[in-house]
Amino acid sequence: VASTDVFVTCVLHVGSKSLSHVLAAIERTKDRLADAGAASDAARSQIISATLAYWSAHPGVALSIIEKLLNYSILTPETVINWALVARAGNTRGEALATAYVYEMVFNTVMKVTGRVRQLVVKPSLGAEETETRDREIKAMRALFAAIEDALASWATGSKDEMIEASEGEGNSEGERMVRRWGQRWLRVFRRRAAIEEAFLVEAEKERARRAEEQAQGGETEVEGLTQMDV
């Protein structure tokens, strides 16, 4: 999406003096960036590509910018995951899995999503609207882990189309073995992360049930006390 690429590059150039300058530039143009991102998945992916291309010498700055764009909902977690594990990994035939900033981008995005879910599930009591929001966020978190699983499984097994097309002989070249190993490592990390979050949900549900029971018992005790006073 050429227009999105040009616009994002201009915003980044205006704020190129420092991280604080670029974050201020994003703050001033967040409405227009939101409109650009809302156009399509391709536009959101282009925002990520433009950001990483402009700050290629300092990927840490690019990651901070992407985090800010996630906070403003200009980007979605799904877009970040697809860009990193499907588009970027595909364009590099899996070699992006060995890049530190790509891993950090995915991990930070997952932690942002799971952190939001944890904040919601530990609340002792929720209204109907908040309960609906909590259930929606849990569903979105599980969908995100499923997308990560789908993307990484094919890299880990060597069945990704890009690997098959580039395969030499039996697909046992050093590069292909390396990609499979990285895919397997990524898969272990995020499967473990998914299991941890599911365990947290179970414990949070138990805690909510315990508190609800305590409140119910407290209410019954209070009613009994008032009844005795009336007598």
Question: Language-model segments: which ranges?
Answer:
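Long alpha-helical repeat solenoid scaffolds
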Residues: 1-231
